[in-house]
Amino acid sequence: KLEPSGWASRKLTTEEATNGIVGHLCSPDQKQSFCITVVKGRFADILAASDLVIGLAGTGNEQAVGLGKPVVTFPGRGPQFSEKFVKIQKRLLGDSISLMTREPSVIAGEILKILTDASIKEKMGAIGLERMGEPGGARKIALQIKEYFDRSKRAI
């Protein structure tokens, strides 16, 4: 499927393969040539370095939004990331994510719009941070549960 559009894969170095890089997809455009690096097992590192996330995973999208990253998403083909699930996630995350149809040209247009308009990117990031809250929520909940049980033991 890469051939008709002109995209090409670039050969990996041994060091890249050792560091979790699976491959590179490079554009045919000579004026604005760029490559997409495909990585496995380095989610946190890639997320931290990303300007935008194309996300098709519930928890992954929520983690990206929680770090202030804009997310472009669309229903997947499998049973887990269905249209129903994506709509529920959109209600949770609001305008920190762009919910698109499975139309490549529409998705690409949305990605370019976000990446080329700093105000949209910043707004989506701010909404994500607000929706997901500050880091440390799970720790705070665990401490509250521990305090509850500690009080219960003293009352006995």
Q: What is each stretch, according to the model?
A:
Residues 1-156:
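Nucleotide-activated sugar donor-binding and catalytic core shared by glycosyltransferases
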